[in-house]
């Protein structure tokens, strides 16, 4: 099953309800550091103070009925080099703190939910994307997990070198667009791939589904190689 899923990820055309966008690849010279978190893994772009790639798995046992813990705030990650992204960098900017690995994917365990509220797992998103398009994609992935499928998930940010924008004193990079994939090894035909623009129009996840080949070709080489290598151990 794994080989079938991998072939879907990097070659076979699947979901085709597509609105064409042109994602911009992060400059290949950007430096990434690996940060192991409880039940998810971050590749953090230290040039943009923003996650380049987050990977995690999702099964029915990860899902429960816990909600965001009362008073839970986003915490600065001491594992990141200075200047570290802070929650205050987002204040009154019009951007939301968008989870890449969502807390709801760990709703069976309050401690694991809390672990997702770290700034190395957060990127600036327009509210429409964060609360609608991206949130719908997350719900779709959880619906597959509730149906007893094991899902392998990746999400990350694209930046354009000719339109760099930053937030706050920590200079948190504002992504031009985001990628997300939900890979289902036991039923590859259910796998879904998304390329989302970071704007106010990203309100329907189905509009931004793409083929696996379009997804793979949009990624920077460094990120694509990381995903391929991680998939072998998943």
Language-model region placement:
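Coil-to-beta-strand transition motifs
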Residues: 22, 37, 47-53, 174-176, ...
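Domain-level detector of nuclease and nuclease-like folds
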Residues: 79-234
């Amino acid at each position: 099953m794994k080989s079938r899923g991998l072939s879907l990820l990097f070659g076979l055309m699947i979901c085709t309800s597509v609105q064409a966008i042109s994602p911009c690849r992060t400059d290949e010279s950007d430096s990434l550091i690996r940060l192991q978190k409880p039940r998810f893994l971050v590749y953090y772009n230290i040039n943009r103070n923003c996650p380049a790639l987050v990977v995690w798995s999702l099964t029915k046992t990860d899902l429960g009925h816990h909600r965001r813990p009362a008073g839970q705030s986003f915490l600065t990650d001491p594992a990141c080099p200075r200047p570290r992204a802070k929650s205050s960098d987002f204040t009154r900017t019009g951007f939301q703190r968008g989870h890449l690995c969502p807390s709801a994917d760990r709703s069976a365990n309050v401690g694991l939910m809390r672990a997702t509220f770290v700034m190395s797992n957060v990127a600036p998103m327009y509210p429409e994307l964060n609360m609608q398009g991206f949130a719908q994609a997350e719900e779709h992935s959880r619906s597959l997990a509730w149906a007893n499928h094991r899902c392998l998930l990746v999400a990350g940010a694209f930046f354009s070198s000719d339109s760099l924008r930053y937030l706050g004193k920590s200079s948190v990079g504002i992504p031009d667009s985001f990628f997300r994939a939900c890979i289902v090894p036991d039923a590859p035909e259910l796998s879904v791939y998304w390329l989302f623009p970071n704007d106010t129009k990203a309100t329907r996840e189905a509009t931004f589904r793409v083929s696996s080949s379009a997804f793979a070709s949009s990624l920077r080489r460094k990120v694509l190689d990381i995903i391929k290598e991680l998939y072998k151990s998943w």
